[in-house]
């Protein structure tokens, strides 16, 4: 599965904000606000990243799901930079 520039932007945002644990994770809304991407783009990207194991679901924030970057996701970023 190919990853595009907008999708890499999401991984970069998670890594730059140290979202690497279940407790330190971002909601879809937070990712949209920081990355300036649409909600549908963020949701589609997160779904792909979950399948690729680049992100995992963190602790819920109220009723909202949160997500953090995994070691696999960090390795993927290192491989392209």
From Swiss-Prot:
Stored InterPro entries: WH-like_DNA-bd_sf (IPR036388), WH_DNA-bd_sf (IPR036390)
GO biological process, one term: plasmid partitioning
An MF annotation (GO) of this entry: DNA binding
Gene3D superfamilies per record: Winged helix-like DNA-binding domain superfamily/Winged helix DNA-binding domain
Compartment list: Host cytoplasm
Primary localization class, coarse: host cell
Disulfide bonds: none
Keyword Repeat included in the entry's annotation: no
Entry superkingdom: Viruses
Keywords carried by this UniProt record: DNA-binding, Host cytoplasm, Plasmid partition
One cellular component (GO) term of this entry: host cell cytoplasm
More about this protein: This bacteriophage also exists as a circular plasmid prophage in its host.
Purpose: A DNA-binding protein that is part of the type III partition system presumably used to ensure correct segregation of this bacteriophage. Binds to tubC (centromere-like site) DNA upstream of its own gene in a sequence-specific fashion (consensus TTGAC); binds to multiple sites in the tubC region, probably spreading from an initial site. Upon binding to tubC forms flexible loops over about 1 kb of DNA that forms 2 rings, covering tubC and the promoter region. This probably shuts off transcription of the operon. DNA is both bent and untwisted by TubR.
Subunit structure, interactors included: Monomer; probably dimerizes when bound to DNA. Binds to TubZ when associated with tubC DNA.
Identification of the protein by name: DNA-binding protein TubR
Originating species: Clostridium botulinum C phage
